Structure formats: structure tokens, C-alpha cells
């Protein structure tokens, strides 16, 4: 009897150790590598370098947050990863490697058949307001399945996706105007999950929702990440939100990733002057500084970018050397694009 109990205990321990080993291995495997990605808008007025030589890496079970002010290039980066940029937007350089496969040179047809919605999906900014008012939720979800996958049980996929986001499957027979803002946001998240992707890009998923519903949506994304092993790339201007959610954070400014690192490191020890200014602008519970700080000046005109650091005109530490393009300095847990650390 004692031997049987010992055997069961040993088996259980081995099972637990095995699972921990799998998690440890997964955490070291690169799921997404973005190398020197460039996405520009080529207009009559000039070229807008919305995403300019952006590089980062996401490993197996990490969540990634992209923060920055309006027009910093966050949404363009998300669209570029899904290859959903519309003219005059265009990817003009760089590489995207997904789970060891370089997907940058894939034809549009191959990308659509094998990657879009199947491996990478996106909850677009304001997507809940683009649901077609004359079609039921179920019929709109069916269109996604028809476009990207054939010979599958549509009802089963729709049922499972709605259940995963905490909605009753009966929602599929309802129209958008019959749903609350929070329910509509859950619907567009369910749409992104339909074909079981490995990565979901969520662009400002809590915009226009009240505080309670915002918290519910973020908790939903956390749950999906935990239960499905889903990698979520959260794009937002809300630093508090991103610090709460993400393992790693990238700070974008004027089309460039100026700092990248762990959420804890960026919060406790921000390096780039822009990151420092952002962190100083959010309230902290135990801060000795009672007054919030604000960033003077405004972002540069993206059509008239000068050589050098793009934060130059607003930086309190700017020096003559900063008129030259700053190098990307590798740190222990990330990098910073700034001459101060050369």
C-alpha cells in the first residue's frame, strides 16, 4: 500500500516537473522576432516614416506592450505585423520571423492562407464600432471562417469562441445594436480567436469603455493568455494599463522604438529621457513627488524629420552629439536608443 502511494506521489511529482520543464523551454523559444522593420506612408506631401527600423523579440509565453503618444507609430506597427496596411502605407524594409519562419517575403496569397488569423490575429482599434449593423454576430463571424478556412464546422467554432470570451452562444443570433459596448468588444476578441492563432494584437482594446468594463476586458485577455498560452501584443497610450498587463514593454516615439525591456525594469529604472518623462507623468501611490510632471513641447512633424534623436527638441539632457542618429544600446534585459548610454 505504501509503495503504491509512493509510486503515485512520484508520478505526480514527475508530471509537475515535466510541465515546469515544458514551460521553462517555451519561455526561451522565440515566438516573434522583428528586425529593422520599416513601414512608411508614401504621400504627395512626402514620406512619413511611421515605423522606422523597429526591432524586438518576444519569447514563448511573454506578453508585450507597445506604449507611446498619439501618432507615434504604434497602430502602424500592429498593422504591419499582420500585413494589413492600406495604401499609401507600405512595408519597405526589415524582416518578421514567426516561430522560426521568415514571413516577410511570403506572397499575399500564402500569407493569407497560412498566417493571417491562423497564427496572428488582430483586434483593430475601434473594431467594435465597425460591426455591420444589418448582419447578426454569427453571420459576421462566419464570413471570417469562410474567407480564411474551408471545410470546418462553423457553428462549433463560433460557439467555442463566444464561450471563451464569456459570452452566451445565443449572442451569435443577435445584432450589434442589441449588445452593450463591453459585449461588442468581447465579440471582436472572439472573432480574433476564431481560427486559434498563437498571437493576438490588441490595439487600444479598452478605448471608449467605462472603467469597470475596461478592467473586465483586461482580465479577459489575461485569462486567455493563461488558459490558451496566447501571446498578446497590447497597443495603448495608457501606461498604467500596460504596466499592469505586459511582461515586456516597448516605448515608441516618432516612429522609433526608443526603449525596450521588462515592465518591471522600465517602471523602476527607465533609461530613455522620453520613458523617464512618461513614467514621471503617471501617479504613483507611494511617490515622494506630489506633483505630476508634463512633457514640454510637441512631437516632431513626421514629414520634416531632422537627422539625430527625434526627442532632441524636448529632451532636458540634449547635447550637440544628439544631432546625430543615436545608436541602439543593448542592456541586460533590453535596449535603449540614446547617446547618454554610449
Regions found by a protein language model. Give the residues of each.
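ABC ATPase NBD coupling module
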Residues: 90, 103-121, 147, 265-270, ...
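P-loop NTP-binding/switch modules centered on Walker-like glycine-rich loops
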Residues: 69, 201, 205, 209-290
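Conserved ABC ATPase "signature" region
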Residues: 102, 153-170, 279
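Conserved ABC ATPase signature
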Residues: 175-179, 183
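A short, flexible loop at the N-terminus of ABC-type nucleotide-binding domains that lies
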Residues: 28-31, 40-53, 84-89, 107-111, ...
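Short catalytic/signature loops enriched in Gly
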Residues: 172, 262-342
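A short, proline-enriched helix->beta-strand linker immediately N-terminal to the Walker B motif
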Residues: 194-198
Amino acid at each position: 500500500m505504501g509503495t503504491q502511494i509512493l509510486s503515485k506521489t512520484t508520478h505526480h511529482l514527475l508530471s509537475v516537473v515535466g510541465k515546469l520543464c515544458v514551460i521553462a523551454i517555451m519561455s526561451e523559444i522565440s515566438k516573434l522576432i522583428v528586425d529593422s522593420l520599416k513601414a512608411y506612408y508614401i504621400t504627395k506631401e512626402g514620406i512619413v516614416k511611421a515605423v522606422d527600423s523597429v526591432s524586438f523579440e518576444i519569447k514563448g509565453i511573454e506578453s508585450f506592450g507597445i506604449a507611446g503618444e498619439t501618432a507615434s507609430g504604434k497602430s502602424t506597427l500592429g498593422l504591419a505585423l499582420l500585413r494589413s496596411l492600406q495604401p499609401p502605407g507600405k512595408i519597405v524594409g526589415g524582416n518578421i520571423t514567426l516561430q522560426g519562419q521568415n514571413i516577410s517575403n511570403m506572397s499575399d496569397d500564402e500569407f493569407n492562407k497560412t498566417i493571417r488569423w491562423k497564427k496572428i490575429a488582430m483586434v483593430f482599434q475601434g473594431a467594435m464600432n465597425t460591426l455591420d449593423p444589418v448582419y447578426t454576430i454569427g453571420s459576421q463571424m462566419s464570413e471570417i471562417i469562410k474567407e480564411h478556412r474551408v471545410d470546418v464546422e462553423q457553428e462549433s467554432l463560433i460557439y467555442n469562441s463566444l464561450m471563451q470570451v464569456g459570452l452566451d452562444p445565443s449572442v451569435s443570433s443577435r445584432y450589434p445594436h442589441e449588445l452593450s459596448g463591453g459585449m461588442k468588444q468581447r465579440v471582436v476578441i472572439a472573432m480574433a480567436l476564431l481560427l486559434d492563432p498563437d498571437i493576438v494584437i490588441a490595439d487600444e482594446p479598452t478605448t471608449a469603455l467605462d472603467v469597470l468594463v475596461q478592467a473586465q476586458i483586461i482580465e479577459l485577455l489575461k485569462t486567455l493568455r493563461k488558459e490558451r498560452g496566447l501571446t498578446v501584443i497590447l497597443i495603448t497610450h495608457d501606461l498604467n494599463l500596460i504596466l499592469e498587463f505586459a511582461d515586456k514593454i516597448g516605448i515608441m516615439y516618432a516612429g522609433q522604438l526608443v526603449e525596450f525591456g521588462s515592465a518591471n525594469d522600465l517602471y523602476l529604472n527607465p533609461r530613455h529621457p522620453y520613458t523617464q518623462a512618461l513614467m514621471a507623468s503617471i501617479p504613483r501611490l507611494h511617490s515622494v513627488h506630489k506633483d505630476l510632471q508634463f512633457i514640454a513641447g510637441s512631437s516632431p512633424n513626421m514629414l520634416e524629420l531632422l537627422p539625430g534623436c527625434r526627442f532632441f527638441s524636448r529632451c532636458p539632457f540634449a547635447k550637440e552629439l544628439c544631432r546625430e542618429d543615436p545608436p541602439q544600446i543593448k542592456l541586460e534585459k533590453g535596449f535603449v536608443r540614446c547617446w547618454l548610454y554610449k
